[in-house]
Amino acid sequence: TFDCWVAYTAPNGKVTAIKPHLAAWVDVRSRMILGDVMCKDANSDILKESLLKLIYHDAGSVPQYIYIDNGKDYTAKDMTGFDRDDRQRTGFDDAAVGFYKSIGIEDFHRALPYYAWVKGQIERFFGTVCGRFSKWFMSYTGTLTGSKTFAKVEKDIDGMLERGELLTMDEFYEAWTNWLHNFYMVKQSSALKR
């Protein structure tokens, strides 16, 4: 979730202020961000869309393995082929395939709950997004000095929405795509310089 607000037009035409969500995958070897999809609320359908974008648009091939978060969207039965609580993967029939295997991914590995550091590459990327992208928007309501909740920036988001000062979701995605491809992806990761 970005720490800035955008104007979102619901299917019924009502415009509200939301914090957009980003679904994306990081290639651990190159640190490239692939399959980025922005949405109002992330769910397993958004993750499917993100993986399909990764395969057909960004990477042009299916990843052999993926490392997934422990969230319910990533571990839903239609994604993995197994019940969320079945860590032993005891399915033996074709019904246990799930979306990941159905598109050609050989295997997936789940992060342990409350161990954010095992997903270091994507978590570090989200920190970079906050520091180098999100903070520059007028609607930014994250922290300026650290990660303390009491240090969050107060803004009149409803007033900004009424005055038309918030970017639309499409405008925000356009700014995001520009930043991702023209600023982030052109720099070599310091972890790869060794």
Feature roles, as predicted:
Residues 1-71, 110-113:
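A short, conserved beta-strand element enriched in hydrophobic/aromatic residues
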